[in-house]
Amino acid sequence: MILAKRLLSGAALAMAATAAGAQPAAPAPGFAVAGTGFVKDGEPYQVISGEIHYVRIPRAYWRDRLRKAKAMGLNTITTYAFWNVHEPRPGVYDFSGQNDIAAFIRDAQAEGLDVILRPGPYVCAEWELGGYPSWLLKDRKLVLRSTDPAYTAAVERWIVRLGQEVKPLLLANGGPIVAVQLENEYGAFGDDKAYLRGLEATYRRAGLADGVLFTSNQASDLAKGSLPQLPSVVNFGSGGAANAVAKLEAYRPGGLRMVGEYWAGWFDKWGEDHHETDGHKEAEEMRFMLQRGYSISLYMVHGGTTFGWMNGADSHTGTDYHPDTTSYDYDAQIDEAGNPRYKYALIAKAIAEVTGKPAAPTPAPTVAVTFPVSPIRRSASLWDNLPDPVRARLPLTFEELDQNYGYVLYRVALPAGGGGTLTLKGMHSYAQVYVDRKLAGTLDRRLGQETVTLPARAGVATLDVLVENTGRVNYSHAIRTEQTGLTGAVTLDGKTLEDWRMYRLPMDDPSSLRFTAAPCVGPCFYEAEMTVDQPGDTYLDVRGLHKGQLWLGSHNLGRFWSIGPVHTLYTPAPWLQRGVNRIIAFDVTGDPSDRLTTVDAPVFGKVTTTREAQ
């Protein structure tokens, strides 16, 4: 309110000066909250934003996606900063190439867009461990999202380092960043105001609180996740606008009217249905909120792809587990390949009607193409490509092995004996169990499986447990216990198995594998070739594979899993070259039937129009 009074006083002085014959002063530069809205350069301003994540879009396409978002009527882009991609190991930072967040923000500015930055450190985002680097979990005593000194010290180092990249891009320094979000939906997690105040102090030391700083929460969590001195905004999905804005207005009657996330779509999880939401309803609610004076950020305006190993997993109780797919299409207005879907024009029309600015023509779609893919040329058995092992009395987690993603093969000797029950307590998150390289069973955390019945053994045998990190949970208190691999006791009929060898398989450089022409069955790498005459966007159809990971040259395109609901991997033109392109697929249950083709559109399984409760 003090700011609003100052603005009114400034306007009155300007009017008085004009009446006296003097030239009115130029509007004060800057961006601020005034009452229930924003002012920019002294004039009322309505933020109309959309979320885009730089790490989910090939860098060559950043400007294209930003341009299409602006053409829809947006004036701002919102993005998270993803700690785990920028600090893969403690004190080792990467802001290059695909991870150059400052370049993405400058690209937004070049397209005439403002930016809202959400540094976290927790971001959720259906992203691995909610954006936290997994090495934080190596210390099992460290408590994420708390005032634990070990945690806050790591956060301080990260936020200060991030500030070196983005502080020059704040509006006050000539950049496009008009606002910064403190934490992320903290009210859905806890209500420790000391934690939020400490994080606010960290932001200030990093120079990230020099402009508008705000908190963002779901409607039922506003009181828990807000600070009295900061503006509070509300997050919700389509169909919930009237209820959510009423709760925000009741919580802060004279406060900022803004929707920090309007979920105009939803994400997919392995083994579940593909989500599609009602674009007509979303356009209707956009119109309602804009007419009511709300600033809005669409989540997502363009989802893109969670390339590589970086998908997260949903969990509400800590015992349920729902890993997210590689595709982050989100049924957004701009689809995974950057093409406007029907929602785009509907929402553009709603924005134009309220703002009075004519809608730009809907951009033409990019036509995807297909390319021939060879049969499997060569293969490499996992058993023949193991590194030197790490030895320990009991199994070590991925984090204790200093490994973030991929697989670990755990090996131990079994005594002779009859069949028994093998228990892998706290197995995270998918395992195949072998006795003398013969598959004895599969365990899937999604299904709550932790036991396998082993066969009888006439002599000493070798037990191998191949464990995949299928994505650490990114939501709920489960994040605090998301160590990956064999995280608890491993017993055979109640007796602890000891003296383990562990083979680290991060699979960050498949080019070093030893391929042969010999056929391969079981956990195998397969090599094929795609011949490209002229690079263009395409989709690799993975219905001829089972479960695993796929690389195009040096690019890790992501996971495939025959359970769906997504049966294609988006393959962007900038990552293709003319001529022969090498494809490597790791299939945990490979066999001679494995094959790949390309298609010109994504392939989804069963569709649902229902969004799960968040």
Name what the model sees in each region.
Residues 153-227:
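Active-site neighborhood of glycoside hydrolase catalytic domains
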Residues 23-76, 106:
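N-terminal carbohydrate-binding accessory modules
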Residues 420-434, 463, 530-553, 560-561, ...:
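Aromatic-lined ligand-binding clefts that engage carbohydrates, nucleic acids, or primary amines
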Residues 91-97, 110, 121-146, 196-200, ...:
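Aromatic- and acidic-residue-enriched segments that line the glycan-binding/catalytic groove
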Residues 62-128, 200, 204:
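Aromatic-lined substrate-binding rim segments of carbohydrate-active enzymes
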Residues 320-321, 340-343, 400, 409, ...:
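A cross-kingdom feature marking solvent-exposed beta-strand/loop segments within repeated
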Residues 100-117, 141-177:
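An active-site-proximal structural segment forming one wall of the substrate-binding cleft
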Residues 206, 237-335, 339, 350:
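Catalytic-core region of carbohydrate-active enzymes that cleave or remodel glycosidic bonds
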